[in-house]
Amino acid sequence: MGIRFYRAHTPGTRNRSVSDFHEITTSTPTKSLTHANHRARGRNHSGSITTRWRGGGHKRLYRQIDFRRDKVGVLARVATVEYDPNRSARIALLHYQDGSKRYILHPQGLAIGAEVMSSPEAPISIGNALPLVNMPLGTEVHNIELRPYNGGQLVRAAGAVAQLVAKEGGFGTLRMPSGEVRLVAKDCWATVGQVGHVESINLTLGKAGRSRWLDRRPRVRGSVMNACDHPHGGGEGRCPIGHPGPLTPWGKPALGQRTRARKKYSDALLVRRRK
């Protein structure tokens, strides 16, 4: 992937950068693998806002991604690499030997025409899926399951990669992109390689309107709100927040306060917290 930079012809193009989409091979998704996507816009079933600063983005078709990789033992060929508006990563269309088609996350370096497979005996090559117990130490993986046969849930964003650093007992030890080191059952499956589109983190939106296209609404600071709307609000002009430390809109400590449950079930699986 490459990055294309705009000249500053207008304030909206100054500092703006976009992907050059050179890895994309088709602009039309496979119709049988797409469906309409009802977007919640940050609301729950009753219409109340449960996630702030969401809504108003461009309409999208949802691409059905195969996170389970459960066609075991069937060889597949990479047919296309496509854009997916629902995630930062690219997706690859696989044509299986039995005639079926599925989308997967596109790993870095997986070329058109390459063959991939999901199997416990699959070789350690980019795009193949197999259990952690069959991988050598040091293998870089993505799309990792938390529970066996539940489908990949970890390490799915563009450029993300985890590393298998140990295997002991019934667990494998993974170093996550955040720096966290955690245990995952050795029977869980993962895909070999790093998620593609690694330069995604270096893209600059350049203008507020581009955030709106992506379903992101303005994030207003609490200090400029009224006192009835936020603990930091109120006062004459710009003034201190009036509290020993920053607070959330609901009056709880913010910015550095640990919010993870003290007795969470997965505490026993965390070897080292994220950085």
UniProtKB/Swiss-Prot annotation:
GO terms for cellular component: chloroplast; mitochondrial large ribosomal subunit. Residues 28-53 are annotated as: Disordered. GO terms for biological process: mitochondrial translation. The keyword DNA damage does not apply. It is found in: Plastid, Chloroplast. The keyword Repressor does not apply. InterPro entries: NA-bd_OB-fold (IPR012340), Rib_uL2_dom2 (IPR014722), Ribosomal_uL2 (IPR002171), Ribosomal_uL2_bac/org-type (IPR005880), Ribosomal_uL2_C (IPR022669), Ribosomal_uL2_CS (IPR022671), Ribosomal_uL2_dom3 (IPR014726), Ribosomal_uL2_RNA-bd_dom (IPR022666). Keywords: Chloroplast, Plastid, Ribonucleoprotein, Ribosomal protein. Part of the 50S ribosomal subunit. HAMAP family: Ribosomal_uL2_B. Belongs to the universal ribosomal protein uL2 family. This is Large ribosomal subunit protein uL2c. It comes from Nephroselmis olivacea (Green alga). The lineage of its organism: Eukaryota, Viridiplantae, Chlorophyta, Nephroselmidophyceae, Nephroselmidales. The gene is rpl2.
